[in-house]
């Protein structure tokens, strides 16, 4: 796990080395795109991200093409509203689609890899 985190950190540093001295990272559990009011609102999620101005956003609890999200590619919806590049890593099949994690980046990464993580409970994914 430490090697994986080191690799991810190195990737993020490479992104920032192009033109900046700092890198703004954000992690966001979007709870299947449903807010505290149980309303699915992609623009509201994008507004939060746009307000922070991150170079990289790691998203958790992300639906893709599920019935509960209106069979939409949620990460693509958010990416379009934030002008960021989207990378999805499915962890499980769910509700007619996939459920997993995502990464949004301002710059196109040199290389990305997804993998499933071992465990006894619900399957997990990792983007490196």
Identify the residue ranges that each predicted region occupies.
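Bacterial Sec-dependent N-terminal signal peptides
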Residues: 1-22
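Basic side chains
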Residues: 2-3, 24, 31, 124
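N-terminal cationic amphipathic segment used for targeting or macromolecule association
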Residues: 12-15, 25, 56, 84
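N-terminal active-site segment of His-dependent metallophosphoesterases
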Residues: 17-40
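Structured beta-strand-rich core segments of catalytic domains in phosphoester-bond hydrolases
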Residues: 22, 37-38, 62-128
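Active-site beta-strand/loop signature of hydrolases that rely on acidic residues for catalysis
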Residues: 23-30, 45-69, 104
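Extracytoplasmic/secreted proteins, especially bacterial periplasmic and envelope-associated proteins
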Residues: 40, 44-51, 73, 77
């Amino acid at each position: 796990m430490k090697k994986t985190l080191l690799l991810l950190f190195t990737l993020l540093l490479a992104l920032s080395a192009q033109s900046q001295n700092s890198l703004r990272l954000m992690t966001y559990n979007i709870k299947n795109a449903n807010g505290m009011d149980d309303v699915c609102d992609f623009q509201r999620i994008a507004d939060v991200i746009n307000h922070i101005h991150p170079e990289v956003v790691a998203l958790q609890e992300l639906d893709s093409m599920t019935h509960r999200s209106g069979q939409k590619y949620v990460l693509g919806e958010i990416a379009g509203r934030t002008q960021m590049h989207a990378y999805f890593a499915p962890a499980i099949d769910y509700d007619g689609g996939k459920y997993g994690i995502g990464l949004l980046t301002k710059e196109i990464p040199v290389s990305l890899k997804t993998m499933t993580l071992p465990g006894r409970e619900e399957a997990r994914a990792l983007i490196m």
